């Protein structure tokens, strides 16, 4: 079943809602990068969050980058998400595994804080017009949802609830997705509504179970979570859209990256390896430039480069 994103409003238009499923997207990322369940879950949460942030951009080609920079053993992660529903990403230490931890109810889960360590969440919004908007906030706990909510509050001054989750078993990813709840500016002036939304967000428990139960029907998920706020999917043509893993790397771009190395370094590479090999961080695609082609590239460069 294809992943999708749904935009909606609630409380008479005072609340903005975005729900996204990223199950197939995450499965592809896991297969491409050889991710452990821990790193797959963390990357999946970041991809869901990135897509939900990108969904509010005005231009179709707008993109959002989320980068977790920290001192933890995961060695950071990076997500590039587009308003068009495409997303890609990678993890610094894809095979990382840590012992699970238990909560007060005896349920076991991943130790996101230990994986992430201390550090920062860097967010970049790029609409293709002028300089991208960049902002950085300290990590709250490394589970992604709270970290992105902190960014929205402190950098965009938008009170938000960000819920990301997944269901897994020993065989892999059963479902993955997220939910974004934002109080729009006019509604933020109504204390009773703000208090109601904050209460509803505090009451959301078992988001991952609710996500799995909706079986990719995100409209049902919105009604399940906010039954008394009358969530209404937008009626325009982009109220819903497909979501997929897609990388923008190409062989031509890889050749362009080789040119930046210069004649001397490429000549040393030719002598040592007989070819050049580049691997895309985002999708793990491998591009090989064979000996004859590499010689042609070197001969086309000025000697001083």
Curated annotation (Swiss-Prot):
Q: Which GO terms describe its cellular component?
A: cytoplasm
Q: Which GO terms describe its molecular function?
A: protein folding chaperone; unfolded protein binding
Disulphide bridges: 247-249, 280-283
Compartments annotated for it: namely: Cytoplasm
Q: GO terms for biological process? A: protein refolding
UniProt function note: Redox regulated molecular chaperone. Protects both thermally unfolding and oxidatively damaged proteins from irreversible aggregation. Plays an important role in the bacterial defense system toward oxidative stress.
HAMAP family in alphabetical order? HslO
Member of which family?
A: Belongs to the HSP33 family.
> How is this protein named in the record?
33 kDa chaperonin
Q: Which organism is it from?
A: Synechococcus sp. (strain CC9902)
Gene for this chain: hslO
């Amino acid at each position: 079943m294809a992943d999708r994103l749904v935009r909606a409003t609630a409380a008479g238009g005072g609340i903005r809602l975005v729900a996204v499923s990223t199950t197939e997207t995450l499965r592809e990322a896991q297969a491409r990068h050889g991710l452990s369940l821990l790193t797959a879950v963390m990357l999946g949460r970041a991809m869901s969050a990135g897509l939900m942030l990108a969904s509010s951009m005005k231009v179709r080609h707008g993109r959002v980058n989320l980068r977790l920079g920290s001192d933890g053993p995961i060695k950071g992660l990076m997500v590039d998400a587009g308003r068009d529903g495409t997303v890609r990403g990678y993890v610094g230490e894809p095979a990382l595994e840590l012992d699970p931890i238990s909560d007060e109810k005896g349920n076991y889960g991943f130790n996101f804080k230990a994986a992430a360590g201390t550090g920062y969440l860097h967010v970049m919004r790029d609409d293709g017009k002028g300089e991208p908007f960049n902002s950085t906030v300290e990590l709250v706990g490394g589970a992604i949802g709270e970290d992105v909510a902190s960014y929205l509050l402190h950098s965009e001054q938008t009170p938000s609830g960000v819920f990301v989750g997944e269901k897994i078993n020993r065989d892999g990813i059963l479902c993955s997705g997220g939910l974004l709840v934002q109080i729009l500016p006019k509604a933020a002036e109504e204390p009773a509504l703000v208090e109601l939304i904050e209460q509803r967000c505090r009451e959301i428990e078992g988001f991952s179970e609710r996500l799995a139960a909706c079986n990719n029907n995100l409209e049902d998920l919105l009604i399940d979570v906010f039954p008394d706020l009358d969530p209404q999917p937008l009626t325009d043509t982009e109220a819903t859209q497909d979501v997929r893993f897609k990388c923008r790397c190409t062989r031509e771009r890889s050749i362009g990256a080789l040119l930046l190395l210069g004649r001397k370094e490429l000549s040393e590479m030719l002598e040592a390896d007989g070819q050049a090999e580049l691997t895309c961080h985002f999708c793990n695609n491998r591009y090989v430039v064979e000996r004859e082609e590499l010689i042609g590239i070197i001969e086309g460069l000025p000697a001083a480069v």
